Structures are given as C-alpha cells and as structure tokens.
C-alpha cells in the first residue's frame, strides 16, 4: 500500500489522505474545489467548481502515475441535482477515450458548502 500526496492538489481538510494505491489501483479521496496553494474555494458556479475539482483530481492521478484514461469509476456528489447537465458539460471534457463507470448523487450538503465533490478509482500505470 502506498500513500499518494502532492502539493498540486489541496491538502486534506480532515483525517484522510489524498489517495492510496493498493494492488495497482488508486483510491482517491473526494476532491472539492479548493485552490491547492491557499486552500480557498474556487468559484461559485457549478462549472467553475467542477473545473477545479477535475484539476485537483488530475494532480492526484499524475502523482500516482495514472490519468483520466485509466479512471475506472467516479462517484460524484452534487449539492444541487439541478446542476447535473451543467456539471456533465465540464466533467465530460476531461475524458478523451472512454467514460468511466459513475454514480452521481444529489446531497443535502458538502464540506465548506461547496457545490461538488468527486472521488475516483483508477488503474495505475505499471
């Protein structure tokens, strides 16, 4: 088991790590739209926040020697399920080949009152 940590993604705001690699798979903790440099929330729209979350995930994938083409599954938590189509428009831009399996769930609230949180499971390049 290997812990993944990068300064290019936000530091954990609780008792968890950015990700762990186990048996060739990366399990990345849920990412919210925080600026990795100062920990501040980026944007107030679902589009801007989704873009930042995906950038944070990209940094974790890179640190783990993976990328969006190797993502197996995502779990997406939306504060406002009405944002679903606008969220999809940004999310889909990050996948070049195939989309991963996915669950998308509307929730009552998220840490720091953000609009989106996404966690991923991805294959790691050997």
From Swiss-Prot:
Transmembrane segments: none annotated. It comes from Lactococcus lactis subsp. lactis (strain IL1403) (Streptococcus lactis). Belongs to the RutC family. It comes from the Bacteria. SUPFAM superfamilies: YjgF-like (SSF55298). InterPro entries: RidA, RidA_CS, RutC-like_sf, YjgF/YER057c/UK114. Pfam families: Ribonuc_L-PSP. This is Putative regulator AldR. PANTHER family: 2-IMINOBUTANOATE/2-IMINOPROPANOATE DEAMINASE RIDA, 2-IMINOBUTANOATE_2-IMINOPROPANOATE DEAMINASE. One of its GO terms (cellular component) is cytosol. The lineage of its organism: Bacteria, Bacillati, Bacillota, Bacilli, Lactobacillales. Implicated in the regulation of isoleucine biosynthesis. GO terms for molecular function: deaminase activity.
């Amino acid at each position: 088991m290997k812990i993944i940590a990068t300064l290019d993604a936000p530091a954990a705001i609780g008792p968890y790590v950015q990700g762990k690699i186990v048996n060739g798979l990366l399990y990345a903790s849920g990412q919210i739209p925080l600026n990795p440099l100062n920990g501040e929330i980026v944007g107030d729209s679902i589009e801007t926040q989704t873009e930042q979350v995906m950038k944070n995930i990209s940094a974790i994938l890179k640190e783990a020697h993976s990328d969006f083409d190797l993502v197996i599954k995502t779990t997406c938590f939306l504060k406002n399920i009405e944002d679903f189509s606008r969220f999809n428009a940004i999310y889909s831009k990050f996948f070049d080949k195939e989309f991963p399996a996915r669950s998308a769930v509307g929730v009552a609230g998220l840490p720091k009152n953000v609009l989106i949180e996404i966690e991923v499971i991805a294959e790691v390049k050997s």
